[in-house]
Amino acid sequence: MSTAREQPIFSTRAHVFQIDPATKRNWIPAGKHALTVSYFYDATRNVYRIISIGGAKAIINSTVTPNMTFTKTSQKFGQWADSRANTVYGLGFASEQHLTQFAEKFQEVKEAARLAREKSQDGGELTSPALGLASHQVPPSPLVSANGPGEEKLFRSQSADAPGPTERERLKKMLSEGSVGEVQWEAEFFALQDSNNKLAGALREANAAAAQWRQQLEAQRAEAERLRQRVAELEAQAASEVTPTGEKEGLGQGQSLEQLEALVQTKDQEIQTLKSQTGGPREALEAAEREETQQKVQDLETRNAELEHQLRAMERSLEEARAERERARAEVGRAAQLLDVSLFELSELREGLARLAEAAP
C-alpha cells in the first residue's frame, strides 16, 4: 500500500449502519460504538475510497464515483448508496457540524474522482493524489445516537437533469420518511437510556461517599466524647486533690505547750517540703495536660463542624442527583410513550401507503 493511501485525506468518527438486505427498509448497526471513518486515495488504482475498520474487518470499503450522492436525512445522519457493494451505508454523527464536514468532503472527493476519471480517460496522470484536498482530521467526540431509513431504490444517486419523481416514487419517499422518524425515536430512546445509566452510576457513587462521610463523622464524634470524659476526669481529680495535713498524735496531758508548738512547726516544715518537691511539678503537668486535651477537643469540634457541613453538602448533591435521575426517568417514559405513538402511526401509515401503492397503476 502506498504512502498516499496510508495517510487519510479526512477522518471523523460516527456510528456506522448498513441497510438490511432482506427488507431494504431497516438499518443494521455495525457495532455498539462509534468507528473511525476516513477518506483515502488509492494511487495504485487512481480511485478514492471511504474506509472504516471495525475490529479485524473492514465495515466500509466504498469506492467514491462521480455519480454517487451523499444525502442528509436528519441533523446528524447521512447516507449514500454503493451500487458496487449493492448496499446503502448510513453514518450517525455526534453533531450537525461533523455531518456537514463529512458531506462537504464527500462533494470534494466526488469532484476529485470525476477529474481523475476524465484524466484517466484522456490518458493523463494525476500528480497530486488528493487533487488539492487538504488533509483534515476531526477530533473524536462522544457520539450521540443517529438514525436513518433505508430502501435501496430510494437512495440511488440522481443527476441534476433527472426527471421529477413519479407518484410511486413519491409514495416510497413518504414511506422512507416514516422509517426515518421511527429510527430517530429509537435513537433518542437509547440516548436517554445511556443518560439514565450514567445518572444511576453517579447516584451510587454519591451514596457510597455519603456513607463514608457518615462513618468518619461517627468516629470523630466518639473521639470527641472520649476526650470530653477525659477532661472531666482531670478536672475532678484536680478539684479533689488531697492536701497533706499533719496528723495530730494523741498527746498526753503531761505535754507542754512548747512541745506542741514545736511539733506543729516541724509538721509545717514537712508539708512545705513535700509541696515544693511534688506539688508544683504535678500541678504544672496536669494543667498542661488539661490545656492540651481542651485544645484537642476544640480541634475535633471544629473538624466535626466541617464534616457536618460537608455531609450536608453531599446530602444536597445526593438529592439533586436523585431529582435529576427522576427527571431522566420521566423523560425516558415520555420518549417511550411518544415512540409507541409514533410506531402505531407509522404502522397505520405503512398500511395506507401499501394500499395506495397496490392501487396505483
Curated annotation (Swiss-Prot):
Family classification: Belongs to the Homer family.
Which ranges carry the WH1 domain?
1-113
Q: Where do the segments described as Disordered lie?
A: 114-169
Disulfide bonds, paired cysteine numbers: none
**Record function comment:** Postsynaptic density scaffolding protein. Binds and cross-links cytoplasmic regions of GRM1, GRM5, ITPR1, DNM3, RYR1, RYR2, SHANK1 and SHANK3. By physically linking GRM1 and GRM5 with ER-associated ITPR1 receptors, it aids the coupling of surface receptors to intracellular calcium release. Isoforms can be differently regulated and may play an important role in maintaining the plasticity at glutamatergic synapses. Negatively regulates T cell activation by inhibiting the calcineurin-NFAT pathway.
Species in which this protein is naturally found = Homo sapiens (Human)
What's an example Gene Ontology biological process for this entry?
regulation of store-operated calcium entry
Entries under Gene3D superfamilies matching the protein: 1.20.5.1700, Pleckstrin-homology domain (PH domain)/Phosphotyrosine-binding domain (PTB)
Q: Which PANTHER family match?
A: HOMER (PTHR10918)
Q: List localization entries.
A: Cytoplasm; Postsynaptic density; Synapse
Mention any one GO cellular component term assigned to this protein in its UniProt record. glutamatergic synapse
Ranges in coiled-coil conformation: 191-243, 254-358
What's this protein's name? Homer protein homolog 3
**What are the recorded GO MF terms, alphabetically?**
G protein-coupled glutamate receptor binding; identical protein binding; protein domain specific binding
Share the domain note from the entry: The WH1 domain interacts with the PPXXF motif in GRM1, GRM5, RYR1, RYR2, ITPR1, SHANK 1 and SHANK3.
Enumerate the InterPro entries for this protein: Homer, Homer_EVH1, PH-like_dom_sf, WH1/EVH1_dom
Q: How does it assemble?
A: Tetramer. Isoform 1 and isoform 2 encode coiled-coil structures that mediate homo- and heteromultimerization. Interacts with NFATC2; interaction is calcium independent; interaction competes with PPP3CA for NFATC2 binding; interaction is reduced by AKT activation. Interacts with NFATC1 and NFATC4. Interacts with SHANK1; forms a high-order complex at least composed of SHANK1 and HOMER3; the complex formation is regulated by CAMK2A-mediated phosphorylation.
Q: Where is this region: Required for interaction with NFATC2?
A: 1-80
Annotated positions of the Phosphoserine modification: S120, S159
Q: Which UniProt keywords apply?
A: Coiled coil, Cytoplasm, Phosphoprotein, Synapse
